[in-house]
Amino acid sequence: RLVLMNPNSFKAKYNLDARTNSEVIRINRAKKTITVRNVLTNEEYTESYDKLVLSPGAAPIVPNVNGTTLEHVFTVRNVVDIERLQKAIVEKDAQNIAVIGGGYIGVEVAENLRLAGRNVTLVQSAPQILRPFDFSMAQILQKEMMDQGIHVVVGDGLAGITTESVILASGKQIKADIVVLAIGVRPETKLVEEAGLEIGTTGGIKVNQNYVTSDPHIYAVGDVIEVYHRLLHKPVRLALAGPAQRQARAVADHIYGIANQNKGVIGSTSIQVFNYAAAATGLTEEAARNAGFQVDSVYVIAPDKVGLMPSSNPLHFKLVYELPTGRILGAQAIGKGNADKRVDVIATLITMGGTIEDLKDLELSYSPMYSTAKDVVNMAALVANNVMAGRFRQVHVSAVRDLVESGAYFVDVREENEFANGHIKGAVNIPLSQLRERMSEIPKDKPVYVHCRSAQRSYNAVMALQGSGWDNVVNVSGSFLGICLYEYFTDVQTGREPIVTAYNFK
């Protein structure tokens, strides 16, 4: 079924013969024909081609566990699937729904079901939802889903489904009137395999830079193919709409003799999770390390627009870069404002081989209603530049718990009233406004970890201390707000002892 267009409008506007309810069941490469079956009448007929373009997409993955064929279990691939799911929920008056899978589809399905007033559990076998984001950034979105009433389960996979519940690998059972499988997708390659076309190492159709398959008369685009990743320098599968539409344009160009070779993908994505916009591009820090890159990252929390504006909100921004070159490898942004704009800037730089040096002086448009004079992307580059040059040292929020539990020395340079509303256990409060008079209280014989709310005041404190002879001071990236966001979800889910006296997300 067509959604945005119909066969009549295709014919009237573009002179295209669009055939719905029609399935291609065979490709005869020798004769350059396809066999088509009308799914309503079962009639079969043959069409010939000069060039054939394949875009069968990808099918939902159904795990090999008991219960996946039960009538209350659904997958989501298209509008028809959504309508079937919606009808079943209404007819059963289903109140408890389990969504299996924490990727984009799973998160979006869970959110919409929760907004419809259902009790929703999201189950993800990996340690986090939304793998295009690093673990530290995903914690912000997991907290948001939890705050909105979704029961988020991570690190526990699906073991089976009964008529009343889902059974997890841990043995836990979750009541479920409806189960939605959103574990991922696999390329629909049955037809092309039967036709003898080459399948790549990733399981997608192998194509060249012009999306030509192993048959020079057959092209393939979309979720069914593997694509070249320009940072990893290897084929990957990337089921995204943006690359798919560019592939379609490139195929049309090539058929008509227009040179337009594919240069590869970097994987730029975005999603809304309730009140937050989230976007990512390139490699996560984890993916970059796993690929063999020597990398570092900076995490900056800055206003998305001038702080005096009533709609100003914190924007969480992570920048991943290669050492020692400073080449930018990836970025992630999460906030209530325009996260996608910031990530699009980084995507452009990655595509052009840009570095931290390029980004720190990049001239971007500015208005108090939309940004700050020094945008968060510039700020992140300045921080990275300072770290690379050795002007100060930083520690990431992921390392703070171990430091606290080992008795490390923390100095909190927020004001006394901020400190009273929540702080790292054992931290010493020396407000930045009092620092120069109280420097003698800070030891020189062991590492001192300095933090504030978002790492800006603590950076100033670190530089002041270094200028006064302290060479043992380290800035906590993300500082107290970042620590609270990083720790909160796992603290609540596992019941472990918090490392803060109280969480403060303001």
Regions found by a protein language model. Give the residues of each.
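Mid-to-C-terminal Rossmann-like scaffold of FAD/NAD(P)H-dependent oxidoreductases
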Residues: 224-337, 368, 372, 376-402, ...
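Glycine-rich dinucleotide-binding loop and its adjacent helix/turn
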Residues: 54-116, 151, 201, 207-209, ...
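Beta1-alpha1 glycine-rich phosphate/pyrophosphate-binding loop at the start
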Residues: 1-23, 61, 110-133, 268, ...
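A Rossmann-like FAD-binding core segment of flavoenzymes
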Residues: 19-40, 47, 115-209, 501-505
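Rossmann-like dinucleotide-binding cores of NAD(P)H-dependent redox enzymes
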Residues: 3, 96-98, 104-160, 238-244, ...
